[in-house]
Curated annotation (Swiss-Prot):
Keyword Magnesium in record: no
Protein name: NADH-quinone oxidoreductase subunit H
Gene: nuoH
GO BP annotations, alphabetical order: aerobic respiration
Main location class: membrane
NCBIfam families in the cross-refs: PRK06076.1-2 (NF004741), PRK06076.1-6 (NF004745)
Any one GO cellular component localisation term in the record: plasma membrane
EC nos: 7.1.1.-
Similarity comment: family membership: Belongs to the complex I subunit 1 family.
Entry-linked InterPro entries: NADH_UbQ_OxRdtase_su1/FPO, NADH_UbQ_OxRdtase_su1_CS
Membrane topology: Multi-pass membrane protein
Subunit structure and binding partners: NDH-1 is composed of 14 different subunits. Subunits NuoA, H, J, K, L, M, N constitute the membrane sector of the complex.
Reactions mediated catalytically: a quinone + NADH + 5 H(+)(in) = a quinol + NAD(+) + 4 H(+)(out)
Compartments, record wording: Cell inner membrane
Species in which this protein is naturally found: Neorickettsia sennetsu (strain ATCC VR-367 / Miyayama)
Amino acid sequence: MLYLVLSKLVWIVLLAIVLILCVAYLTYAERKVIAATQLRVGPDLVGPFGLLQPIADAIKVLLKEIIIPNAASPKLFLFAPVIIFVLALVGWAVIPFGTSEIDGVEVPTVIANVNLGVMYLLGVAALEVYGTIIAGWASKSSYSFLGALRSASQMISYEIVIAPVVMTVILLTGSLNLAEIVVIKHSLPYWVDILMLPMTFIFFVSILAETNRHPFDLPEAEAELVSGYNVEYSSIPFALFFLGEYANMILSSSIMATLFLGGWYPPINWWGLSIVPGFIWFILKIVFVLFCFLIVRATLPRYRYDQLMRLCWKVFLPVTLLWIVVIGGLVAFNIV
């Protein structure tokens, strides 16, 4: 029992360290991708090819003074970024990275293989809103509060879209366990993946909105709200918001890879691809989704707020509800 607890603790610490490093170099990759689309070089002065730029940025931010506005609520002001950062980490507890063989039995490589993994992730995503609202309210700034209100309405609206999208996957697989979903979905015929393409697209757009990423980064629209709900933050609290945003990007990409892209299985059932370890395939799929995040930021203009809400309530929600009926009918008549 003690060995099991210690092994899980080691897993958690290693995962947290790796995730923070991934966040650091995701910012580097983002700047390089955007620079390439604009025919610029990007960061290339600090270290070879600019590879030490994230470390320089981290040192610069951490050496800044922590400033708390006079009118702010100090405890809530400092608690809000901790909420966002911690919630970005705890979601990884149920993400399966692959499979490993123990006593001749294949078991998923995951910190906590719970049967309600999907519900757990939806619950964690719902709690993210509280960190944003607390940050905006505790700052006692009009810009912060308006950014927090925008973010809350945006995140809640798109959670309502994400839930029925995930419901279509649950109907297809008959399970809430993420590892079982990957295995069952892999056994389904290929035409099911084609049928699920609209849901895959809607899920991707929804996680863009859920993570407040471009073109839906309206809570931090520079021309209107300066920096949004985190405008009063500096130093370590600001860094926690920054880490939370990019860690949520990676978490959302891993969820998409698990539910829609086949998890740790190769994209095509060909013997040459099956030689590659499943963990590598899972990482490559996450990198692909993250690259889509970056390309979207580099190429698309920002949506207006009314366009964002109209897309959610008048386009995505009706389509997802229709798809639930379609998938439910296919399952009910044993076509899938």
